[in-house]
């Protein structure tokens, strides 16, 4: 069960990711258990878990990082009027992959007692957009994108947030995921992490630039 008490507002050192991070994972977006949107109202993009074989010491739990989707199949667009997003299939001429913040779980989800390990990624809105999961923001509506099954997704895991927990209720699970989103968002807003999303190429380290190139190269 989740321990009582307040959560830390950020995860990971302020100086930036430390080994083993960043962790690279990629694969086509596949159908998951079908619970994220239907039961929880939290859309997730699942990718095959086979890539975890390269990281045998990576523990189950909740993580944060950044993702990119193949722009040839999914073109990200931001609706400036509502602070929400939409997409259209197929990238326009010269369009590149957008790098977006993400929170994800790796494991078995004790609340649902899954038998197989999964990678479930919730893609969040850009850090420059209002947070739909901020406390006091009114009704919580998790960020939602149109379906993009089959689209190649690349993921850089930049840090670890917490272990997996079981919960006394569905509402308690949803609330902890809301907090996970806020912890991920605040963690990624720190300069040493934000550079993975939209850092000035001249200001980023060579290591960060190399990771960004991998992320958007489809």
Curated annotation (Swiss-Prot):
<dbReference type="GO" id="GO:0005524">
    <property type="term" value="F:ATP binding"/>
</dbReference>
<dbReference type="GO" id="GO:0009398">
    <property type="term" value="P:FMN biosynthetic process"/>
</dbReference>
<keyword id="KW-0547">Nucleotide-binding</keyword>
<dbReference type="GO" id="GO:0009231">
    <property type="term" value="P:riboflavin biosynthetic process"/>
</dbReference>
<protein>
    <recommendedName>
        <fullName>Riboflavin kinase</fullName>
        <ecNumber>2.7.1.26</ecNumber>
    </recommendedName>
</protein>
<feature type="binding site">
    <location>
        <position position="44"/>
    </location>
    <ligand>
        <name>Mg(2+)</name>
    </ligand>
</feature>
<keyword id="KW-0479">Metal-binding</keyword>
<comment type="function">
    <text>Catalyzes the phosphorylation of riboflavin (vitamin B2) to form flavin mononucleotide (FMN) coenzyme.</text>
</comment>
<keyword id="KW-0418">Kinase</keyword>
<comment type="similarity">
    <text>Belongs to the flavokinase family.</text>
</comment>
<keyword id="KW-0288">FMN</keyword>
<dbReference type="InterPro" id="IPR023468">
    <property type="entry name" value="Riboflavin_kinase"/>
</dbReference>
<dbReference type="GO" id="GO:0005739">
    <property type="term" value="C:mitochondrion"/>
</dbReference>
<feature type="region of interest" description="Disordered">
    <location>
        <begin position="1"/>
        <end position="27"/>
    </location>
</feature>
<feature type="binding site">
    <location>
        <position position="46"/>
    </location>
    <ligand>
        <name>Mg(2+)</name>
    </ligand>
</feature>
<dbReference type="GO" id="GO:0046872">
    <property type="term" value="F:metal ion binding"/>
</dbReference>
<dbReference type="Pfam" id="PF01687">
    <property type="entry name" value="Flavokinase"/>
</dbReference>
<keyword id="KW-0862">Zinc</keyword>
<keyword id="KW-0285">Flavoprotein</keyword>
<keyword id="KW-0067">ATP-binding</keyword>
<dbReference type="GO" id="GO:0008531">
    <property type="term" value="F:riboflavin kinase activity"/>
</dbReference>
<comment type="pathway">
    <text>Cofactor biosynthesis; FMN biosynthesis; FMN from riboflavin (ATP route): step 1/1.</text>
</comment>
<keyword id="KW-0808">Transferase</keyword>
<keyword id="KW-0460">Magnesium</keyword>
<dbReference type="InterPro" id="IPR015865">
    <property type="entry name" value="Riboflavin_kinase_bac/euk"/>
</dbReference>
<dbReference type="InterPro" id="IPR023465">
    <property type="entry name" value="Riboflavin_kinase_dom_sf"/>
</dbReference>
<feature type="active site" description="Nucleophile">
    <location>
        <position position="120"/>
    </location>
</feature>
């Amino acid at each position: 069960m989740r321990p009582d008490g307040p959560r830390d507002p950020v995860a990971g050192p302020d100086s930036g990711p430390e080994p083993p991070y960043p962790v690279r994972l990629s694969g086509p977006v596949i159908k998951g258990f079908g619970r994220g949107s239907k039961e929880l109202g939290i859309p997730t993009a699942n990718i095959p878990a086979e890539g975890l074989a390269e990281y045998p010491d990576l523990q189950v739990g909740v993580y944060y990082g950044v993702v990119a989707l193949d722009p040839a199949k999914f073109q990200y667009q931001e609706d400036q009027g509502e602070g929400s997003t939409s997409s259209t299939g197929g990238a326009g001429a010269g369009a590149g992959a957008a790098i977006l913040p993400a929170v994800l779980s790796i494991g078995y989800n004790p609340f649902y007692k899954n038998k197989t390990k999964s990678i479930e990624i919730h893609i969040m809105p850009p850090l420059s957009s209002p947070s739909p999961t901020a406390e006091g923001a009114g009704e919580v509506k998790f960020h939602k994108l149109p379906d993009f099954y089959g689209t190649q997704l690349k993921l850089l895991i930049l840090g670890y947030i917490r272990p997996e927990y079981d919960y006394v209720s569905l509402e308690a699970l949803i609330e902890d995921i809301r907090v996970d989103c806020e912890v991920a968002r605040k963690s990624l807003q720190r300069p040493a992490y934000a550079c993975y999303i939209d850092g000035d190429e001249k200001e980023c380290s060579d290591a960060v630039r190399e990771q960004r190139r991998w992320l958007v190269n489809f």
